[in-house]
Amino acid sequence: MKTIFKLMIVAVCALSAAGCCQNKECTCTADKQMAVQLYSARDLIGNPELYAKNHEEVLKAIADMGYTGVEAASYNDGLLYGVTPEEFKADIEAVGMEVISSHISKQLSPEELASGDFTESLAWWDKAITAHKAAGMRYIVCPYMAVPATLKDLKTYCEYYNEIGRRCKAAGMGFGYHNHSHEFQKVEGEVMLDYMIANTDPELVFYQMDVYWVVYGHASPVEYFNKYPGRFKVLHIKDAKEIGQSGMVGFDAIFNNAETAGMAEFIIEVEGCRNEQAIEGLRVSADYIKTSPFVKASY
């Protein structure tokens, strides 16, 4: 099985090197800055055991496609993918990429939510912030929270996120929240995402807009850029499967309005391709970005 996996990696790397530049009119730019959410390859490196077995081949294949940075998605008790922060950073840099950010989450307990005392959860965050600083992260992003029952609970979470953001800022990192589609539901008449943006400090909390989930939630990324300019420091560029293949996400409009959004960088996530097909999905997505004239070399 591992031999087959290696052969697939080699084949995809060969396609990456030649596939997008087969004609003389190709506008491929090999040095565009684009990061990848490693959750895309979760079936290959998504836990400590898989990471230990496959990370060298997978990370090299991703780097060979033109990806320049990574966002992690496996943190537990001071370790990233089962290795120390320093080891993880070295693994990424060994293939020529850099560590950008990480998805981690610590939900409030019912007692904390009721009392507004976050002491226990903030101790967890202090350890996580120290680990992510050691890994060279620029950002930490909370990837999920459930829809709360009341606005009071949602306000408590906003205060919690402000405090996490304050601690990240003190450590020299940014803190953000990543949306899915459920944040467009209403809580006591208020759209959850709008309420969160309005009740978090822009100096402490940015929003990592996942453009696919915004569209899936029947909203417009560009309308949100215009409504809350500067709040979307990092974007998740995602589609139903490979980037640019579904036709449902207007990536040209999104990138053409990146300055209004406040976008400093973007991260590609291919969530709909599983197992070894994730590698091919990442290649197709990288080629789409490299050949799209509306995507600048850097932001």
Language-model segments: which ranges?
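Short acidic/polar active-site loop segments enriched in Thr and Asp
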Residues: 68, 98, 138-139, 233, ...
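Histidine-acidic metal/acid-base catalytic patches
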Residues: 2, 21-65, 190-209, 213-299
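Active-site acidic/histidine proton-transfer and metal-coordination neighborhood
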Residues: 98, 110-206, 279
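N-terminal pre-domain/capping segments
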Residues: 21-135, 287, 291-299
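C-terminal motif of bacterial Sec signal peptides marking the signal peptidase cleavage site
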Residues: 16-19
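Acidic-and-aromatic substrate-binding clefts and catalytic sites of carbohydrate-active enzymes
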Residues: 42-51, 72-84, 106-122, 146-155, ...
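Sec-dependent signal peptide recognition
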Residues: 2-10
